[in-house]
């Protein structure tokens, strides 16, 4: 009887050992997951002919993998330059928590490339980009500004950014709307912050938080044609 129990226990141990090693996880690879993040978030700047070094191919990225991981975890890259949750922007290029986790795990697993190049996404194309024209009705804010008429706000464009600037709109009804909190922003990567939805700022709204010599443009929402 004792021998039978020992035999059964040994068999269970073997089965448990085999099951532990039978569990397989699919590795995160450049071809399947990581390239998609880079193509979507990085190549507007990091490509041949772009404003910074190329991150198009695995051979470009792999030697810099640890440096890239540290840069994205610290939110230095992509250079979005604003605190998430302070304002809501439709062109937010900051990486999601899921994307950050994928990059972190990929680097921890020694940056596998993957065996199937057909998993790579289609390479995005980029044409020549002229600086966006600033609408004549944009409002420049340097210091505290009180709006004399209603303004339909579509976004903000820092002209001379000061890190840490927190821009708010104090409405006549006493409420305060957070607009933009610059953090790690660089004029080298000057860009618009476009609101998820246009925001109506009534006459009498006070825009605060921009201390000279910093200045920010309030961008008007496109006017809708009448039908």
Task: Give a label for each model feature.
Residues 18-143, 208-226:
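Aromatic- and Gly/Pro-enriched helix-to-coil junctions and flexible linker segments
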Residues 7-15:
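Bacterial N-terminal signal peptides
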Residues 133-201, 208-227:
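His-enriched metal-coordination microenvironments in redox/metal-binding proteins
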Residues 1-6:
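Bacterial N-terminal signal peptides that target proteins for export
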Residues 15, 35, 43, 94, ...:
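Short linear sequence elements within intrinsically disordered, low-complexity coil regions
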């Amino acid at each position: 009887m004792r021998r039978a129990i020992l035999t059964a226990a040994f068999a269970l141990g073997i089965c448990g050992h085999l099951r532990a090693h039978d569990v397989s996880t699919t590795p995160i690879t450049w071809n399947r997951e990581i390239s998609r993040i880079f193509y979507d978030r990085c190549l507007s700047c990091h490509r041949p002919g772009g404003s910074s070094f190329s991150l198009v191919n695995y051979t470009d990225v792999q030697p810099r993998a640890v440096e890239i991981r540290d840069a994205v975890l610290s939110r230095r890259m992509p250079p979005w330059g604003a605190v998430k949750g302070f304002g809501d922007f439709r062109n937010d290029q900051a990486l999601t928590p899921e994307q950050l986790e994928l990059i972190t795990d990929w680097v921890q697993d020694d940056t596998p490339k993957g065996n199937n190049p057909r998993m790579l996404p289609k390479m995005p194309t980029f044409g020549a980009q002229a600086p966006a024209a600033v609408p004549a009705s944009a409002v420049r804010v340097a210091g505290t500004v009180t709006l004399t008429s209603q303004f339909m706000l579509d976004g903000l464009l820092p002209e001379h950014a000061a890190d840490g600037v927190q821009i708010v709109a104090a409405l006549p009804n006493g409420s305060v709307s957070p607009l933009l909190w610059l953090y790690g922003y660089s004029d080298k990567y000057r860009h618009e912050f476009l609101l998820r939805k246009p925001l109506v700022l009534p006459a009498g709204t006070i825009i605060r938080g921009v201390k000279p010599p910093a200045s920010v443009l309030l961008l008007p929402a496109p006017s809708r044609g009448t039908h």
